[in-house]
Structures are given as structure tokens and as C-alpha cells.
């Protein structure tokens, strides 16, 4: 019911509520996460380049991952190797058998603050941390051997050969790089496929955002959709440890998260939609191609024509560039072709400047916007803005634009919330990995499905008017009866 207010008498509101005009609040989806038995060793860099407050962020990340595991002698065992110029075994796979003990032990870890001997640390993992004397179990298809390496610098020793030996020994290696880390080194360390095993964040302040990825990586569960253990009305989609509901083409998911309603947005509804896309250097060329696929995924769900949906596209970095205005292309095919041709700008992240452009130009009549047609902006960014966004973000919403904020990687949650329309939880999305933005695209497809008459106000108002007419007629009759009674009383007296 965005942007629509129906002023009704209390009695009528209660009647409508009892008849189910408004849906119940969203229900939580089912969850069931069980981790496959795993010998997990964290290998964490605490060299002098990692400041004490940054090292605390690493400890928070470790704790968050551990919180999502089934910890125990017969399930997941956890060890931690701390390294700099030397290697310190903080605790072994056999040391702690409960989650509470592990979390307390992580909090006691202190940085070593010297050099960066990453190869030495990986060798220690092979020869010591994953040995049976330290609590590792015999190599088996039923038990995962996993190492997570976290580093922020270039190693002072070789990593390629020792990492290859670790992988040959059956150890699956994830490499997380922070800040000015050497990406080539991360690729030498990590297991294949590299896209799944190499992660990068700009700073330790955002490393915690990778938590969800690793919780999902360790989560195994039976297919709840296949077993029928769900309450989706139309389509059930399995996710690690849970499931989500979706709807068939032509339907949109209701607020309860499980039932579907026919969506009239594809036939007869007008919409002016502008994408505001971050093309800064931190996105990287291969990820920018994924962003273009994300845009076209949403475009594919629209009915594009002069009377229905119009699409515009703006890219920004240190400056703002309009790729094409609203209404330039009259069909989906031409829009998608133009998106594919969009060149990557690189450079900085001036989100505030881009939002100002959206407000001042993108939704102007001169750029194809239509008076009286709903305006929707989708802002996509992967990092902290280098300028001020508050005023432009507020103005966009004050003007009635419906704003969605999509963040990936190092995007700042507070900025996403500031951009997003109310209710904020329904208008901002975040993922740590560009490869999963298609999941957000599916959610946005349903969100921007515009109902021709979202709260059926016309019908309700007609009903309200009829009721009020009947009440007025009844009041007039009662007044007439009262006057007659009064006249009779006067005659009797």
C-alpha cells in the first residue's frame, strides 16, 4: 500500500481487518542447519601491519563463524594458528570440545606484531595442526578438512608449493585478503574453484560481512523442499539450512512470505525505473559484468512500452554518466543490448553526487519521466561513498521516489539504510559476494511489481460512501421519529 492512505471509520477498519483485507505480518521461514563433520583450522595473520583494533575485528569474525557451527568431538572441531614472523598454535583441534570454550579461547588470542610468514604457517597446518596427535581425524569422505587463511599483506616467504601440498593432502583452503593484500598470493593459496575460495574486503571493519558465506559453506541439510517440510503455496527453493518461497510468473509473493497474489504490474501499470550503478574501481571488470546481468535480470521481468514500464540507466564513479534516459528504448531487447554495451568507468565512489543527479535530472520530464507515474530508483554500490549522501537521499524520498538500495562486498549498511525507502527492511539488500546478486534480483522483481490498485481504495471508498449515505438516511428518520414523539408528549401534557 505504498503511498496510499485510506481514511476510514474505526468500525469499517475493524470490519476490513476481520475480513482479511490486510495480510498478517511476515512469518519466519523454517531453519534447519547441521554442519558436516569438519576439522577446521583458522590461520590468521597478526603481523605488524594488522593494528590491535583490526585484530579484534578478526576475532569477531572467527567467533561469528564458530557460532554457526555444530561443535563437538563427533561433529566440527576447531583449531587456530596465529602467525607473523613465527607461528603460534593458539589451540588445537582437540583442545576445546564445546562452542562456549572455543569462543572464550578466541577472545584470549593476542597479536604477534612482527613479519608475515604465510608459507610457514601453512606448513605448520600440514605437519602439525591437521595431525592426529593434535586432534585431526583420519582422512575420510565423511569428514571435511578446511583451512581459512586471513591475511592483509604480501608474504615474506613462498606460498605456492606449500599450498599445493596442503591441497594434495585433502585440505580445502579458503583465502581471505584484506586491504593492500597481494591478490596473486591469495590465488596461489586457495583451492579451486578460485571464485568460491578467494574473498577480498577493503578493510578489517567489514570482514564480519563474510560470516554468512562461511556459515552457509559449512551448512549441510536435507532438501526441505523435496521432503515437503515447507509451507510455500507455489514454489519452494532450497537454501543452506532453510528454504524460501517464490511465485510463478504473473504472481507476486505476499507479506507472509509463503502465499502468492496475481500481479497486475505486467499489464496496464506504468512505471518509471532508473538504475543508479556504482562503476568505481573497487567493483572490478569481471564483477561489473555480473552487475550488468543483474540489471537485465530485472528488465526481463518488466512489460516495457510507452504506456507501461520505462527504464533509464546512470553509472557513477568519481563523476556521473547517464547511459540512457527514460523512454529512449521502447522494448526489453533494446534496453538489454544497451546495458551489455555499457563501458566500465572505474575511479572513485561519489554516491551522493549520483543521487543528486537522480533527483535533479533522471526523473525530469526532459529526460523522459511521465507526470503522475510511479518513480522507482535502484541504487547499486559496493563501497563507502566518498561524499555526503544524506541530503540527496532524503530529497529523493521526499519527492515520492521509491528507493531501493543494493549493497555488495564493502558496502556500508548505514548508507544503504539511509538511501532506502520505508519500510527500510523491505527496500535494502546486501550480499558479500557479487556472484549471489542474482538472488537479490529475484527479490527486486517481486518488489517492483506495481499493482494497478494496491489497496483497492476505489472500491473501499465506494463502500464507505454507501454506508455513510445509509447512516445519514437512518439518522434523518430517527430525527423525524424523535420530533413526532416530542409532539405527542406535548399534546399529552
Curated annotation (Swiss-Prot):
Signal peptide: 1-23
EGF-like domain sequence ranges: 221-261
Keywords assigned: Coiled coil, Disulfide bond, EGF-like domain, Extracellular matrix, Glycoprotein, Repeat, Secreted, Signal
Expressed in which tissues: Expressed in xyphoid cartilage and chondrocytes (at protein level).
Keyword Signal appears in the UniProt entry: yes
SUPFAM superfamilies: Chicken cartilage matrix protein (SSF58002), vWA-like (SSF53300)
S-S bridge residues: 225-236, 232-245, 247-260
GO-annotated molecular function: calcium ion binding
Gene3D superfamilies the UniProt entry points to: 1.20.5.30, Laminin, von Willebrand factor, type A domain
Main localization, broad class: secreted
Glycosylation sites recorded in the entry for this protein: 74
Coiled-coil ranges (or none): 462-492
Localization annotation: Secreted, Extracellular space, Extracellular matrix
UniProt GO cellular component terms: collagen-containing extracellular matrix; extracellular region
Task of the protein: A major component of the extracellular matrix of non-articular cartilage. Binds to type 2 collagens and forms long concatenated protein networks as part of the extracellular matrix. Required for the network-like organization and bundling of collagen fibrils surrounding chondrocytes in the zones of maturation and hypertrophy. Required for mechanotransduction and adaption to mechanical loading in cartilage chondrocytes, resulting in an increase in expression of the extracellular matrix components ACAN and COL2A1. Acts as a moderator of angiogenesis in response to injury.
Name this protein carries in UniProt: Matrilin-1
Lineage of origin: Eukaryota, Metazoa, Chordata, Craniata, Vertebrata
GN (gene name): MATN1
